[in-house]
Design a protein with these regions (language model features):
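Hydrophobic face of amphipathic alpha-helices that form TPR/SEL1-like repeat modules
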Residues: 1-69
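Residue-level signature of catalytic and energy-coupling elements of molecular machines
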Residues: 48, 104, 148, 182, ...
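Beta-sheet entry/capping signal
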Residues: 43, 71, 123, 181, ...
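Short, glycine-/Ser/Thr-/acidic-enriched flexible segments
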Residues: 49-51, 64, 73-79, 115, ...
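Glycine-rich loop-to-alpha-helix module at the N-terminal edge of alpha/beta enzyme cores
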Residues: 60-159
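Generic structural "secondary-structure junction" signal
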Residues: 46-47, 74, 98-100, 160, ...
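Conserved small-residue-rich beta-alpha loop and adjacent elements
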Residues: 161-211
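Short glycine- and Lys/Arg-enriched binding-loop motifs that mark or flank ligand-binding interfaces
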Residues: 44, 156, 176
Length: 211
């Protein structure tokens, strides 16, 4: 796959002007959509298989703690699922590392476009999940989009064989290679942007992750 992106196209995702009545109305609609989906249970996913543990915990809105945003499985000292996730990611790495770097970059560009299409919805989730203001949530989503665009272009920049200083009688090459499986543990205060940045940087370089 040959990407049509060029290194000089990267621009920061613009923030939403909520003083525009149309933008404010669109965001309110996104909030109502997300509100209707609150309280659902979200399973653990390993290798495409959905798993649920007996013990659960609620993720609640910090501004209104009676509001349950989502229900999640609660782990304990049993690390078997963690071991399984790492092993599964290791298996995926064997094929993912061989995907051409331009194709890996194109996946990030596609992810950025999908996030643009659902920008208000993603931001609305953060209004409930961490009680962000509209502008703070919008900035978080914009930064996540920026990470996709930035790391995709960085992969295009560094993915090919790099120049080396020639030495008489030697034949040298210099290229970056993927290393394996990484663990992504993002902070709570930027639930989309930092998670996206850590994940996209690793994945576009040919690695796999456990998130």
């Amino acid at each position: 796959m040959q990407t049509q992106r060029s290194l000089d196209e990267c621009r920061n995702e613009p923030f939403t002007d909520f003083s525009n009545p149309a933008n404010a109305a669109a965001f309110k609609a996104a909030l109502e959509k997300v509100r209707s989906e609150l309280g659902r249970e979200y399973p653990i996913v390993i290798g495409g298989e959905k798993l649920s543990l007996d013990h659960k915990f609620n993720s609640t809105d910090p501004a209104e703690k009676s509001r349950v945003v989502g229900v999640f499985s609660e782990g304990d000292t049993d690390t078997s699922l963690v071991d399984r996730a790492i092993a599964t990611a290791g298996e995926a790495f064997l094929s993912w590392r061989n995907v051409p770097y331009a194709e890996r970059a194109e996946y990030l560009f596609k992810a950025a476009e999908l996030m643009r299409q659902r920008k208000h919805e993603l931001s609305a989730w953060m209004v409930f999940e961490v009680s962000k203001t509209w502008a703070e949530a919008d900035g978080d989503t914009a930064e996540a989009i920026d990470f996709c665009e930035f790391y995709g272009r960085e992969m295009l920049r560094w993915g090919s064989e790099q120049p080396v200083t020639p030495n008489p009688g030697e034949e040298n090459t210099f290229e970056y290679i993927p290393l394996g499986v990484g663990a992504i543990i993002p902070p709570w205060n930027f639930p989309l942007a930092i998670m996206a940045g850590m994940t996209m940087a690793a994945v576009v370089a040919g690695n796999t992750v456990v998130l």
